[in-house]
């Protein structure tokens, strides 16, 4: 009991102090709630700086009549704009409905027209088919009657034969009369006039020619002279100088240049610049002469490096010369044409066919072929070789030999190597001996002056041929 009394007295004496502490905590909590954000958890929100700022703006807006008027005008315009947009939506909806209705009407009309056309065509075709069937039935009945009559009247064979021919004539006449109806005859007439089979046949022939035939390209190894000119040639050599038409810009530039040349300032400047230009040209010539005639090893080293890096190569200069003579020259087409010519040239060379060699080879190659041929014949040697395959045709070198360009082509062939004597007996190789032979051809360009007046572009001839090696396969 004494302890309880002591605790009660202590609480009663310290009660004012607890009340003061509680009051301070409440004040601190209120002060914190003023600085909480809008999404805070407090239920009571006091006025802040932003609310006072908004109140000031509202007061100024209410006190300013012009601002209120502009706000009202903006509201009215927004309402008008809303009305216009609604009206536009209604109009677009109406126009789309009209378009859909028109499209449906056109579609229904087209369907009805198509049905009418198809029904009329079906009726016409059915009528024509019925007419043809009736004509066939009539012909069959007449044939059956003629057959029965010929069986019963075997004694009168000649008369029955004449009657059957007459009946056949009547059958074809009736069939022709059935076909002479306006509907069927019109159909056959249209088919005859259209001639679809002829058109299709012509188209197929054109496609076959395009697929089978090679595209027309200029020949580099053959010269085909044009057909002779049958018209009259003019012998007049008069020349008339005609002035070329200038554009407006060129005319203005010419007039401006003439005015500038006539001005005294331009004349004075040109008179002053002429000695300067002449002096600079003299200095440049002196420097060039010193550079070219210098004995300094450093200068020689620089010149060698310049020639090494900046000088045009032999192949480039050769190709440039070829294109200057023949602008339509193409190296891939040239290699393809060489591949086509290899077989006839090698066969003609082994057989001694001079006429074929004249088309593709130079005089030196033909003379070499005839000399080798006569030498082998005197010794009784006969080559029975046969060319099997040609591969790996490529252009290896292009260079100049004097004034004429030279192209060296490489290729390899597979040949049957067989050497016989005068009696036809095999001396070397055999019919089963196959060799791979590596060839090199030197093609030289022939000038147009050597070909004649009709030649426009130069052509190429086989200037030299050699075998680099032979490898036995079988």
From Swiss-Prot:
SUPFAM superfamilies cross-referenced by the UniProt entry: NTF2-like (SSF54427)
Coiled-coil regions, chain positions: 68-88
Pfam families for this protein: Tim44
Any one GO cellular component localisation term in the record: TIM23 mitochondrial import inner membrane translocase complex
Compositional bias of kind Polar residues: 145-165
UniProt note on tissues of expression: Expressed in roots, flowers, young cotyledons and leaves.
Gene Ontology biological process: protein targeting to mitochondrion
Name of the protein described by the UniProt record: Mitochondrial import inner membrane translocase subunit TIM44-1
Subunit text: Probable component of the PAM complex at least composed of a mitochondrial HSP70 protein, TIMM44 and TIMM14. The complex interacts with the TIMM23 component of the TIM17:23 complex.
Function: Essential component of the PAM complex, a complex required for the translocation of transit peptide-containing proteins from the inner membrane into the mitochondrial matrix in an ATP-dependent manner. Recruits mitochondrial HSP70 to drive protein translocation into the matrix using ATP as an energy source.
SMART domains per UniProt: Tim44
Region (Disordered): 132-165
GO molecular function term, any single one: ABC-type protein transporter activity
Targeting presequence: 1-54
Biased composition (Basic and acidic residues): 132-143
Cell compartment(s), UniProt: Mitochondrion inner membrane
UniProt cross-references to Gene3D superfamilies, sorted A to Z: 3.10.450.240
